[in-house]
Amino acid sequence: FKKMDSPTNDGFNSFSASYAAKKSKKKVLLTGVGGDELFSGYPSFNRIPKITKIMNMLPSNINLKNFYLSKFEKFLKNNRLNTKIAGLFKYGKSVDKAFLLQRSLFLPEEIQEILLSNQNQLNINQLNIFNSIEDDVKGFENMRISIIYLEIKYYLCAKLLKDIDWTSMSNSIEMRTPLVDWIFFKKIIPLIKSNIKIGKKDLFNCYSEKLPMEIYKRKKTGFSIPHKKLLNQYTNSNYRFKYSKPIKDWSIFCFKNYLSYEKN
């Protein structure tokens, strides 16, 4: 938390990798960020088309009024259920809003509540999120390209690369991003526009004769962040969980801790 230069809930993994590299006296790390954005590796590429298709098939008179939606959201929250279910009716008809629903942890109404609870006078409407993201996708040929652009702008650039920057620098590690390369982008985009189905496996197969077999055949490994365990560890098991997903509680915890360190 002391080394954060902006609040984030997603930097723990990059920090851990950088810290481990530092301990083992490594100087440079490679990261594959950018691959999921270009090769449609995220769930959003399958979910958003399905969400928008289903929500636009519903009769117009089934749209719930804001009054009932807020009641529904409150019910979901009180019972520690996923409030995004209510958000489907409000944000599920267009690719831009469905993307926000897919990527965000909280609904805009919940964010406003969090800001107010932390004595922040900023109104969520002042951020002009919806108009901005709607303008971003105007003129794109198809939904896949729209999602690629949104993933690159709002997740890769606004979050992942920022997290990689401060977490690696705070551990004196150089983090290289070979897939975030303008020349590589220009080579791939025409294939995407032509609707040729390409995935990360196709990129990997390009190196089948250039990589040692023990690397080429090695199974992918990964790890997840134990949000619940971390919260209990930081608070001596005194944390009162409010949400169905511990990552939501972890995000608020990171936000509040960042503010407290910033004040000091």
PLM regions and their residue ranges:
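A polyampholytic, Gly/Pro-enriched intrinsically disordered region
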Residues: 3-9, 75-79, 238-240
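Catalytic metal-binding/acid-base residues of hydrolase active sites
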Residues: 34-36
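ATP-dependent adenylation/nucleotidyltransferase module used to activate substrates
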Residues: 9-32, 156
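Adenosyl-5′-phosphate
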Residues: 28, 83-264
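Short intrinsically disordered, low-complexity coil segments enriched in acidic
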Residues: 1-5, 72, 243-246, 250
